[in-house]
Amino acid sequence: MSLGLVGRKVGMTRIFAEDGRSVPVTVLDVSNNRVTQIKTPESDGYAAVQVTFGKRRASRVGKPLAGHLAKAGVEAGHMLKEFRVETEQVAGFKAGDVVGVDLFAVGQKVDVTGTSIGKGFSGVGKRHNFSSNRASHGNSVSHNAPGSIGMAQDPGRVFPGKRMAGQYGNTTCTTQGLEVVRVDVERQLLLVKGAVPGSKGGDVIVRPAVKARG
């Protein structure tokens, strides 16, 4: 349980290390993260910090959310995200505070959550990496068919979770253990090694890695 940041994916590029290696990185814009609410064990039963980022037109904000933000004295943002934290961490924040990119350090491992790029309705080959059937030798119309999806009269049904064709992508997923290679405090940009889920401009959530790796 630790505080993170929300932002958007700018895109991918590369930087060069001191030894000349080309390092592929994803640029994340985590500017203007503002605290909208502080939750404490006394009032809410747990400790958490709620943040928002970016800007949103007032006409796009519903009355309940507008009232919530007005109470905190915070301008409407693009999204709200709550981070569970330790009880002692809550004391260091109050509504309206700005959380900067210096929350992270170079070399630190982070987990990045985003919405994967949607691929539409896809077959089992693309969606689940199934192999195709035989091209010939008696096969005529079943080249990319999934094959059998059940058994016999017993159980007489298709079990839930059976891998079949359907919507592929457009799901929330997390890439774990990405290394922070650069922290741009001036422009509030975070550069992490490798790719993160989602398309350019997509919302992302960055938090310290939950799994320690050597």
Curated annotation (Swiss-Prot):
GO terms for biological process: translation. GO terms for cellular component: cytosolic large ribosomal subunit. It comes from the Bacteria. One of its GO terms (molecular function) is structural constituent of ribosome. It holds the Pfam family Ribosomal_L3. The modification N5-methylglutamine is found at residue 153. The keyword Transmembrane helix does not apply. Part of the 50S ribosomal subunit. Forms a cluster with proteins L14 and L19. This is Large ribosomal subunit protein uL3.
